[in-house]
């Protein structure tokens, strides 16, 4: 009987520990800046968004697209670049990681994921003017 109680107590402690540790082990949806920096480059352009219809498809860098990730497509910035996207109308901003190519429509500078568009307030407009701040280029290997 004592042995069973010990095993039950150990199992309960293990389950509680897993619920405490598991959230800490979750992978981030975007890389964070390695250090606080001023933008390398700043410019203004139009942003559009792409979302759930693209979920599960491969991006240009080979990752699987997730509309809830903090990612974006840009025509020529290196994959892994970190860009702060600022809605010029509202001042809302989000840090994104470039993992895809596009947009392919003239006059558009960046395509952001659905999550980013939602946070910036771009969903209903579809296309909005944004300020792009290149914060970090990927490390060369």
Where are these regions (language model features)?
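Secreted/periplasmic proteins
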Residues: 2-141
């Amino acid at each position: 009987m004592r042995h069973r109680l010990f095993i039950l107590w150990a199992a309960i402690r293990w389950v509680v520990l897993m619920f405490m540790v598991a959230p800490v082990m979750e992978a981030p949806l975007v890389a964070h800046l390695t250090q606080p920096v001023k933008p390398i480059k700043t410019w203004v352009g139009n942003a559009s968004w792409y979302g759930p219809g693209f979920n599960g498809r491969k991006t240009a860098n080979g990752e699987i697209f997730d509309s809830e990730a903090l990612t974006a497509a840009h025509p020529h910035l290196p994959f892994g670049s970190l860009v702060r996207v600022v809605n010029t109308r509202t001042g809302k901003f989000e840090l994104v990681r470039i993992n895809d190519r596009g947009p392919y429509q003239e006059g558009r500078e960046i395509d952001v994921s659905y999550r980013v568009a939602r946070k910036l307030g771009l969903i209903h407009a579809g296309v909005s003017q944004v300020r792009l701040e290149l914060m970090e280029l990927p490390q060369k290997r």
